[in-house]
Each structure stands twice: as structure tokens, then as C-alpha cells.
């Protein structure tokens, strides 16, 4: 065991105690203060070289971050399904990007541990929240994880997305290696569905469930305006499995009763193994100030 004093200018010194496990290329330990409060610490040795490569992990992985069941349809909690796209290189190098369930864009990089773990820590919302935890990439090309997400208050005076924040939530993370296909999933059609985030009370809600024809070039074409009055469109990126779309919703104004348009934007990732895509949509409230934005779940289904 190695004990390292960590001096601080205020609050007393800290003590870092580490135990190294050379055979496992890892270490564990604790970081404690003078009052014996402590947190656990773990890490791994950087083992990847041009000789000992991470080629057995090297790929693009699409993972989703879903709320646990008790948080479903809780209006004070963002209801979108977040996602991360993780690119793993041959020397353990990783780059990842995605969105959280409130539409917040996330991006970062790091080093894959020898056992396929990828730690993530992001400070968000002007340091009033975070996204932190570990992705686990397995040799069977699946992704799981233990990641938590929180927001304690508005990030700025202009913040209009779940302004009061929400307590720490442990997300359900699943995913797989992305396998490019033409067309994706070998499908000829893909269908949309939307849930939560206030979408069910929209006047045109039932018209959002649409089925598009999928070409061999991965172009998704929806019917004309007579059967697709919200003009839903989706663009697929077959190399990564990302999908991005929009629709225009028309509701009566809550005061004037005149038709009022709102743009529903959404994005997500496809899962080669599950043959389904999940993601997050953003929906501005009807124009009664202040206009706030709610989020919910979007799903793209193959037959």
C-alpha cells in the first residue's frame, strides 16, 4: 500500500491510500479527510501500445441512457433517452459524443481500461450538475454501464429546460457495436413513435406515428402531407447509426385559439443488435411566457 498526503490551503489535508495489483493492471484505494470521511478510488495502468493493442475492442459503439422505471413519466425529470457514441481506437484511445435526456450535448475523450471500462466525468449546467460513471464494453461487443446524472438548478438566467433541476439519477445504460448495413437492419421500412414530455396532449399526437420507406441508400421517405400533416422527416447517418429529425406541430393558442406552430426536434442512435433506435425529442411549451422546453422519448422501429 502507498499512502500519499494531499495538502490543501483550506479544509485540512487529505490522505490518498492506494493498493496496486500489478497482475490485474489496476489499483484501488481511498481518499480521506481528517474527519475520516472517505471516498473510494480506483484506476488502471495504461497498457496499450502498438504491440499490445486494443484491437479486440476497436469499433464504434452506440449506447443509450434510459431512466429507471420509477422515473418514467415524472414531469419534473427529463424523459428523453440519452445516448453516447463511443469510438475506440487500437491503442485504447476513445472519443465519444452524444446527448443526455434533456437534449444537452456531451462530448469527451479518454483511455479504455484493460478490462473494457471507460470512465466518464462531465461537469454540466455551469457546474450545477454532472454526468459521471463508467461504461463497460464487453468482448461480446455489448455496452453496459453505471452512470449518474443530476442538475441542481438553472445554468443561467436564459435556461428554460427543467430549470429547477432534478436529483441524482442512476441511468440504465445498454448498447452494442454498430454494424453498418445498406439498408440499416436490412429493413425496407422504419416506423416512429413518441412518448412522454407532454407529447400525448398535443393535438396532432396520433399523427406522429408514421412509417417511412427505407431505400438501399438509407434514405427514409415518409408519405405526403395528406397522411403526414406534421411533415415528419428523418435523416440517417449509416456509418454511425445516428438519426436526426423534426416535425411541425400545430395546436390552438391557449389564449387566442388561433393555430400555433411548434417545431419538434429529435435525435438518437440505432442499435444493430436490437434493430431499434432510441433518442430524445425537445418540445417547446405553447407560447405563454416563459416558454419552457420539455423532453421525451423517440423510438425508430424496424419491422
Regions found by a protein language model. Give the residues of each.
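Mature soluble binding/inhibitory domains
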Residues: 1-303
Amino acid at each position: 500500500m502507498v499512502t500519499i498526503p494531499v495538502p490543501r490551503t483550506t479544509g485540512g489535508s487529505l490522505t490518498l491510500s492506494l493498493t496496486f495489483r500489478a497482475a490485474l493492471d489496476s489499483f484501488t484505494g481511498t481518499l480521506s479527510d481528517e474527519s475520516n470521511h472517505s471516498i473510494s478510488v480506483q484506476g488502471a495502468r495504461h497498457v496499450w501500445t502498438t504491440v499490445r493493442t486494443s484491437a479486440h475492442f476497436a469499433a464504434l459503439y452506440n449506447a443509450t441512457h434510459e431512466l429507471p422505471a420509477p422515473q418514467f413519466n415524472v414531469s419534473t425529470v427529463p424523459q428523453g433517452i440519452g445516448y453516447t457514441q463511443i469510438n475506440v481506437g487500437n491503442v485504447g484511445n476513445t472519443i465519444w459524443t452524444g446527448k443526455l435526456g434533456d437534449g444537452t450535448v456531451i462530448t469527451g475523450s479518454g483511455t479504455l481500461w484493460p478490462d473494457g471500462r471507460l470512465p466518464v466525468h462531465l461537469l454540466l449546467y455551469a457546474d450545477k450538475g454532472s454526468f459521471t460513471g463508467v461504461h463497460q464494453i464487453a468482448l461480446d461487443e455489448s455496452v453496459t454501464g453505471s452512470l449518474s446524472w443530476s442538475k441542481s438548478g438553472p445554468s443561467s438566467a436564459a435556461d428554460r429546460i427543467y430549470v429547477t433541476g432534478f436529483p441524482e439519477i442512476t441511468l440504465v445504460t445498454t448498447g452494442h457495436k454498430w454494424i453498418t448495413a445498406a439498408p440499416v437492419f436490412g429493413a425496407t421500412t422504419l416506423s416512429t413513435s413518441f412518448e412522454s414530455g407532454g407529447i400525448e396532449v398535443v393535438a396532432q399526437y396520433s399523427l406522429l406515428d408514421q412509417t417511412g420507406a427505407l431505400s438501399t441508400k438509407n434514405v427514409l421517405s415518409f408519405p405526403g402531407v395528406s397522411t403526414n400533416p406534421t411533415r415528419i422527416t428523418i435523416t440517417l447517418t449509416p456509418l454511425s447509426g445516428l438519426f436526426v429529425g423534426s416535425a411541425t406541430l400545430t395546436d390552438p393558442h391557449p389564449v387566442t385559439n388561433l393555430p400555433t406552430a411548434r417545431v419538434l426536434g429529435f435525435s438518437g442512435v440505432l442499435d444493430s443488435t436490437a434493430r431499434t433506435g432510441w433518442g430524445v425529442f425537445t418540445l417547446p411549451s405553447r407560447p405563454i411566457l416563459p416558454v419552457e422546453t420539455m423532453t421525451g422519448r423517440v423510438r425508430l422501429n424496424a419491422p
